[in-house]
From Swiss-Prot:
Belongs to the RNase PH family. Keywords: Nucleotidyltransferase, RNA-binding, rRNA processing, Transferase, tRNA processing, tRNA-binding. This is Ribonuclease PH. It comes from the Bacteria. It catalyses: tRNA(n+1) + phosphate = tRNA(n) + a ribonucleoside 5'-diphosphate. The gene is rph. One of its GO terms (biological process) is rRNA catabolic process. NCBIfam families: RNasePH. It comes from Burkholderia thailandensis (strain ATCC 700388 / DSM 13276 / CCUG 48851 / CIP 106301 / E264). Phosphorolytic 3'-5' exoribonuclease that plays an important role in tRNA 3'-end maturation. Removes nucleotide residues following the 3'-CCA terminus of tRNAs; can also add nucleotides to the ends of RNA molecules by using nucleoside diphosphates as substrates, but this may not be physiologically important. Probably plays a role in initiation of 16S rRNA degradation (leading to ribosome degradation) during starvation. Homohexameric ring arranged as a trimer of dimers. Signal peptide: none annotated. InterPro entries: ExoRNase_PH_dom1, ExoRNase_PH_dom2, ExoRNase_PH_dom2_sf, PNPase/RNase_PH_dom_sf, Ribosomal_Su5_D2-typ_SF, RNase_PH, RNase_PH_bac-type, RNase_PH_CS.
Length: 243
């Protein structure tokens, strides 16, 4: 696919930013990753907690949950820490719930046993697509954490049933494009976030028109772009885990 209106980055319409997944990025967490989508950089850690929420007590199954945050100067201007304000924004709550839903879609929580896998996604630099980068990186961190559980004999098998990754797509300059950076995201006509499994199943589709409604044909084109992009992200996840 080509784009008659050049992207600010010079990328093709169907081209991801440079994606890097660096495992074992921090020392203490059972799984840790630095994931980079171009200039967007997120540290994702996976921590094993040997207890479950009260609503799962005595059921014998596990739980997976996520938290998301941004450093004060992850963006162009400084923002106060949410802890200093004493309240999470609606955006933060929405994103961390999305990350949790995305990962739970590919986890057999019964196989995890009575413990919680806690994912923390901290944005150290934001240039668009922080939630999609967080999901993609958090999966790799979670994979490393459960691999350690299996190796330690705490669980009999991996609870992971498939890969999961996420990407943004949108209509920019009148054409569908893949993996929006900040310049594109702030000026696009349509913005959509797509979460899919390695097998091609949809976990979540979030799409919004920014003043100019999009057609069914445009939506189909966006989903096709997203599916191809997520296929490439899954390939990169596999390569990182096999390294």
């Amino acid at each position: 696919m080509t784009n008659s209106s050049p992207r600010p980055s010079g990328r093709r319409a169907d081209q991801l930013r440079d994606v890097r997944i660096t495992r074992h990025y921090t020392k203490h967490a059972e799984g840790s990753v630095l994931v980079e989508f171009g200039e967007t950089k997120v540290i994702c850690t996976a921590s094993v907690v040997e207890r479950v929420p009260e609503f799962l007590r005595e059921r014998g199954q596990g739980w997976l949950t996520a938290e998301y945050g941004m450093l004060p100067r992850a963006t162009h201007t400084r923002s106060d820490r949410e802890a200093a304000r004493g309240k999470q924004t609606g955006r933060t709550q929405e994103i961390q719930r999305l990350i949790g839903r995305a990962l739970r879609a590919v986890f057999d929580l019964n196989a995890l046993g009575p413990r919680t896998l806690h994912l923390d996604c901290d944005v150290i630099q934001a240039d668009g697509g922080t939630r999609t980068a967080s999901i993609t990186g958090a999966f790799v961190a979670a994979h490393d954490a459960v691999t350690k559980l299996v190796a330690a004999g705490k669980i009999a098998r991996s609870p992971i049933t498939d890969y999961v990754a996420a990407i943004s797509v949108g209509v920019f300059g009148g054409a569908p494009v893949l993996d929006l950076d900040y310049d594109e995201d702030s000026a696009c006509d349509t913005d959509m976030n797509v979460v899919m499994t390695g097998a091609g199943g949809f976990v979540e589709v979030q799409g919004t028109a920014e003043g100019v409604p999009f057609s069914r044909a445009e939506m189909n084109a966006l989903l096709d772009l997203a599916q191809a992009g997520i296929g490439e992200l899954v390939r990169l996840q596999r390569a990182a885990l096999e390294a």
